[in-house]
UniProtKB/Swiss-Prot annotation:
Glycans are attached at residues 62, 288, 291, 591, 656. GO terms for biological process: hyaluronan metabolic process. CDD domains: vWA_interalpha_trypsin_inhibitor. Gene3D superfamilies: von Willebrand factor, type A domain. This is Inter-alpha-trypsin inhibitor heavy chain H1. Residues 39-168 form the VIT domain. It comes from Mesocricetus auratus.
Amino acid sequence: MDGAAVGLRVLLGLGLVSLLTLEAMPAAWGLATTGRPRAREKRQAVDTTPDGVLVKSLKVNCKVTSRFAHYIITSQVVNRQPNEAREVAFDVEIPKTAFISDFAITADGNTFIGDIKDKASAWKQYRKAISGENAGLVRTSGRNMEQFTIHITVGAQSKATFQLTYEEVLKRRLTQYDIVIKVKPKQLVQHFEIDVDIFEPQGISKLDAQASFLSKELAAQTIKESFSGKKGHVLFRPTVSQQQQPCPTCSTSWLNGDFKVTYDVNRDKLCDLLVANNYFAHFFAPKNLTNMSKNLVFVIDISGSMEGQKVKQTKEALLKILGDVKPGDSFDLVLFGSRVQSWKGSLVPATQANLQAAQDFVRRFSLAGATNLNGGLLRGIEILNKAQGSHPELSSPASILIMLTDGEPTEGETDRSQILKNVRNAIRGRFPLYNLGFGHDLDFNFLEVMSMENSGWAQRIYEDHDATQQLQGFYNQVANPLLTDVELQYPQDSVLSLTQHRHKQYYDGSEIVVAGRIADHKLSTFKADVRARGERQEFKATCLVDEEEMKKLLRERGHMLENHVERLWAYLTIQELLAKRMKMEGEERANLSSQALKMSLDYQFVTPLTSMTIRGLTDEDGLEPTIDKTPEDSQPLVKVGPRRTFVLSATQPSPTARSSVVSKLPNQVTGVDTDPHFIIYVPQKEDSLCFNINEEPGVILSLVQDPDTGFSVNGQLIGSKPSRPGQHEATYFGRLGISNPPSDFQLEVTPRNITLNPSSGGPVFSWRDQATPQKDGVLVTINKKRNLVVSVEDGATFEIVLHRTWKGSAAHQDFLGFYVLDSSRMSARTRGLLGQFFCPLDFEVSDIRPGSDPMKLDATMRVKNRQLAVTRGLQRDYSKDPRHGTEVSCWFIHNNGAGLIDGVHTDYIVPDIF
């Protein structure tokens, strides 16, 4: 993992390109999202809508709770052209260490939502992308960033909204946490806002916000920052006129640079232990410790490939670093090309005379030969081992080995596996090894594995004008060791799934974070012990936290994520599993990959093992865009294949076979819920139809039946006692059965349990579980106490919503709702109360008139060569919000859907759930 990739960093842009030109040339960049209108904003004398496209708003919202950052970026663009479509490009750049968890594009009521699945399935589904044609998102990689770009068309007089969510654990570096947002809109944005909200139980000790592109006067006017106790807040909301300064007549924005928020927390108490919902997070960064003296060896590549700027910048950095080595430290330098040479051959004290002599040696050395990396490292290790063996354990300084190379081993031992073994056997866990890889022409994965195997990390040094500063920045992170052999201990019988809790060294200005899962039995208190070695003494500490007091503390969190401690644990665990798999092979690597994949799917993270596809959004070849994590070794700003433009439903013709819109806003849902109300969205009409089915409890109804594949969904009704005599007994779905015979898959779902293949004694899951069981191309994603999603490979995707009843609710039993997310690959012969509507449906509504209920309209509908009396009404869609739901306006067909459904409703009664 790249040690320099810390904090949060994001770059956004909306590029506006005219569809009328043969060559797509960007006319402007913009940022947009939902924001508040400005009161008394003066009318601008300039055009803020180049090409007729208005970047209406942008909101960057970051909520941090105990280092866990939840980031939502929402942007909106409006095409004001009366008759012409426009192409819009959405660019987002996020840290490589962050995980995307959600992405959606909305246009004219149609929402296209990201669907996270394992990468193998995603690429199997989109084979054309593998053959070199990019499936829509440009996957690029900067220094510590990943960039995604998607081009879509927005119809005349239409708008598009983008929303991206990602999460990360902030890393403390050089005494502070950083949130950096790089903005570059160029075009004026009507409503621009960056809102950062921080909650830290220890209390916030400092908070600062700066923008590189602001004068002091403008910063004072536009940046509002405050902190008190546990809460901190930063708001940046420039008006359009402020965006134009210092050029009031310009149509471009001066917003161009870094917006940076930095903060730290109080360290008055040794313990920062957070417990919530059977998960804990422990943040360890004690203050007032004495700096340890250190033994430091630099191993420097002087092979011929280092010529030019590389060796010049390396020498500059070494000279400055040697100037910062403290009295009491000891050091040496090892150089390797074809031969290996050391400055002294053993450690010498950091006296002024020795430091000056070392600087002279650095100025004079020249490049020579090939790359004997193995020999150079073993010489450096030998020097440190010899020095360490001469000290009693308690008085031993902290030993650090740092290697800088720009190439691959070409002299001496060149087999990478053998080099890893040699280094591992020589160090034997005594001290950390940090590898710095200069440039891109090297095997960075090799350096990374070597560092991880030896308690350190690897960092890439980019060939740029600031390479000297990059090298110095790395050294500053490890310059002041405070503790060695740090171990954080927890009750063995109470803690499960612990993240890394042993660290070779702890450095000033950093922080050790450990998270874990607490066993189900209730604990009134939770304890952590810390053992380490400091400067000439042992370090011991005990932390104790009362869970009830912790609950009171967490209730103070106005915007706290309900499960943020659990997601923090999941984030750290996945990162560690991915790091461990790098140095494993065969079955061990496969097991680690399987664990990381399962957790990535459980928590809906885009990781190196998963991909996010955007359902329903397609280009001219029918490809859907995908979001992937880029590999570390990928070159920055490299585009794969030609640019593709994806078309939103607002500009698509009516489909002839299936609606291309798969995931929709609440008024565009197909499903059945409550007692039971069927809702059918008809994309050709951009309207919905609805009907009820009145049957007795115990009756099983066919919802989906595909005769070509045998796939089926059936639902059994349960009853609810009427609230007063003579009232009809309401019924709900209390049991659902999904069957896919080609894969021998069955799933039985009730409000109590979820059973996979019940006829053969398959596993049983509770709604309290977060799980992703999979069988032969069918993936079930159980989202704890909320819903589950069934995805059939090359088939369909369905959602089952859990409804828990409460006192006073209409239903007296828990029940289920069923929704269709993707039916595009079901056959044209699919039947069932829902399945028959997967094919295109046409209808006409006429004679709209006031109904017997003055709040509703009646009308006449022509559908399937029948004329029906219908009523305009409201139903509720619970697919996005199971507790409250969202209103759906629809034409209601009376008498159990008579005239709309094929046959009569009793034709859909079946004898069994499968």
